[in-house]
Amino acid sequence: MVDTYTVNDHFINKDASVRALYDQLVLLLQTFGPIQEDPKKTSIHLNRKSALAGVETRKDYLLLNIKSNHAIQNPRIVKAEQVSAKRFHHKVRISSPNDLDEELKTWLEEAYILSE
């Protein structure tokens, strides 16, 4: 038997602001073009043709994992990992609508283009 998960499953017992942040994030990504939400057991993958980001929900914030083809040096990055020669994952904490700013939008647009 295969377990299936929904986006809503990830917001059970979470602050309502976390869902609002997620919805704003999805709207931001949709300014670049279509995306698909792919809920997994522990995260929600956001895909174009391939995954461009992943979202882990926490009690009162989101942990956003952005894919890139280069290292991003920035204090907002709470964790960075080089997963292959030309692939990096960068985790960013999203705690308020102010965190969904132009800088983050630039990183997400790069990830969107990369996932083509």
Give the positions of each predicted feature.
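Charge-dense, helix-prone N-terminal extensions
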Residues: 1-116
